[in-house]
């Protein structure tokens, strides 16, 4: 059976033992917070990652409007924040590896190229800012194309039932950005993705608890 966490439900199905197959996917959401500032100096505040069940908040570094003067593209590292999905309590006798699929959520959307687009109707939101997600470990560094098949990074589940999936998120310009006629404006940046963790098993169904 497929397990349900908050935001997604899956059709139940029966699997027979004895061959490699996919285990119940775990699901959750990640909300990315950021800020584009008109200030001329940087003011720092301790940054933390908050967890509520399988729903997480990640705060990117504050950046400035001037940082968007030239095109950044999908290789941007502006304000980059690295984060990890930690898997634990996996049955390592049956769960062999894990991967995560990311889709837009909570009013966010995506571009055809897979960039994450914040909702446009939020009061005080920065304009012409998108977010770019990428793999950052387990031999994978490719762009995560939101709302497309993107669970390309595989984490091996170790003997103690743990595994890690490594990612990074950064600012980039929105698809309507133009340095002269449609520049980035100051304001908050908030976008959300839903993730589903898939686990490959060898004999029987098993689940993992994810968190960071």
Regions found by a protein language model. Give the residues of each.
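Gram-negative bacterial Sec-dependent N-terminal signal peptides
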Residues: 1-22
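Mature extracellular/passenger domains of Gram-negative fimbrial/pilin and adhesin proteins
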Residues: 2-3, 21-212
């Amino acid at each position: 059976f497929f397990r349900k966490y908050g935001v997604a439900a899956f059709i139940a199905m029966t699997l027979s033992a004895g061959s490699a197959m996919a285990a119940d996917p775990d699901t959750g959401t990640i909300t990315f917070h950021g800020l584009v500032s008109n200030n001329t100096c940087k003011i720092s505040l301790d940054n933390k990652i908050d967890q509520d069940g399988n729903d997480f908040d990640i705060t990117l570094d504050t950046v400035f409007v001037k940082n968007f003067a030239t095109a950044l593209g999908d290789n941007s590292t502006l304000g980059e924040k690295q984060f990890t999905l930690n898997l634990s309590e996996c049955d390592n006798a049956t769960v062999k590896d894990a991967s995560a699929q990311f889709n837009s959520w909570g009013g966010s959307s995506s571009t055809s190229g897979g960039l994450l687009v914040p909702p446009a109707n939020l009061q005080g939101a920065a304009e012409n800012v998108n977010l770019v997600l990428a793999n950052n470990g387990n031999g994978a560094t490719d762009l995560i194309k939101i709302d497309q098949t993107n669970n390309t990074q595989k984490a091996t589940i170790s003997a103690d039932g743990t595994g890690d999936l490594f990612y990074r998120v950064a600012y980039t310009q929105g698809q309507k950005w133009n340095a002269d006629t449609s520049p980035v404006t100051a304001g908050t940046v908030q976008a959300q993705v839903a993730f589903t963790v898939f686990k490959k098993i060898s004999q029987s169904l098993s689940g993992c608890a994810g968190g960071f």
